[in-house]
């Protein structure tokens, strides 16, 4: 009897289950239908908890991302504020451009007609600029200890500098055999030679080409001025901030930041002082000074000019070609 009752109950369950599936009344999945009610509710609660935790973590991540972006925005703005285009342009000025800028009249846009030193001074700037960039050096002094002015200029690297004038001078020095001395190269690049076979070494229109470089860098502008019978291209100053920073740098080197030791000075700044003096434009940087400051500045410049280039070139951490150019102008 019990056996028949169990069979009857089983068949009834099967019939009810099949009817429920066929009519689509059962909304509980098959795997959850066999679970007790408390287990099903627990699963639903746990799944809801996981969803809430996932959503909370997403919201927190979004907030962190937004806050991170807000933190980066002021930093970017600070970096942009710190980037001064004037400073960037000043750092790109070569020694030749700095010397020419000191010699140019701000409004007129040309150098003094009576200045016959700036031409050779600019050629000396080219040699030092190439030496500071690792393109030129002096030959070894040897056992006999040749003097600076007797040693030849050697091409250390012929890699382009990106400056047309410097690359042109570098090509001349590289292709010339036998090599020439510093004094000879200053004369050859200036065209001051009696040998007609060496006139092709002369670099032409140097001041005009340097002025055009300064125009491209936003320091100068280009104008035409009429001088009685002919027109002349001039380059008046358009960005006075750069020139003022240059003048201030030269003044501070011999006043507030004077170190009384040329080897503790920046090599480029030291070369600028020497070559600006040799080009007869250094006093233009000292013109705004008071009388006491002017006297002190010129006194310290004279101290630099009285140095012995031969002895200074033998000291550690020095540039021999720089002192060779100084010797060529101060001999």
Please give the residue ranges for each predicted region.
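Leucine-rich, amphipathic alpha-helical/linker segments
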Residues: 173, 177-206, 253-283
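Acidic, Ser/Thr/Pro-enriched low-complexity segments and adjacent helix/loop capping patches
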Residues: 195-203, 217, 223-225, 231
